Amino acid sequence: MVRKPARMYRNLAKKAYCRREYMGGVPGLKVVQFDMGNLSEDFPVAIHLEALEACQIRHTAMEAARINMNRRLMKTVGRNNFHLKIRAYPHHVLREHKQATGAGADRVSEGMRLAFGKAVGTAARVAPRQRVFTVWTTPQYVDQAKDALLHSGYKLPTPVRVIVEN
């Protein structure tokens, strides 16, 4: 089956569905790491990526943003000059009621009978002005870190802004 478009899951329409003990099975998390870079050093500058609207960010989008950001930071700043942290965790389980399509689908399909849906992935529920990613670095690399955060924000389903703190 084809993955549904992200706009179906973007809005916070229903309450959080995260009690996994009642679910048959939930697909694994795509986000591999939540902390990257130099974890031992204390950096003076913090740069945050803040979501401007309430939304749900799918774990696949978070992983795409993480890969993009980490790659840009590794190339421009270097492994030892930053600490990247993902601050939102995808707890919410997304469900999908599979529909048969194509020739003869009406004979195979059950319609809306048992339409609760099966778990297809997870998402992080983000509030307005919540910080999703944070990069700590030195003052000389602030522009490169801002650029990396901004470009990874294009992968997320909400408008974002970059905030610099000393």
Swiss-Prot record:
Keywords, alphabetical: Ribonucleoprotein, Ribosomal protein
BP GO terms, sorted: translation
Pfam family, one: Ribosomal_L16
InterPro entries: Ribosomal_uL16, Ribosomal_uL16_arc, Ribosomal_uL16_CS_euk_arc, Ribosomal_uL16_dom, Ribosomal_uL16_euk_arch, Ribosomal_uL16_sf
GO cellular component, one term: ribonucleoprotein complex
Top-level taxonomic group: Archaea
Claim: ATP-binding is one of the keywords in the record: no
GO molecular function terms noted in the UniProt entry: structural constituent of ribosome
Disulfide bonds: none
Stated family: Belongs to the universal ribosomal protein uL16 family.
Protein name: Large ribosomal subunit protein uL16
Source organism of this protein record: Methanocorpusculum labreanum (strain ATCC 43576 / DSM 4855 / Z)
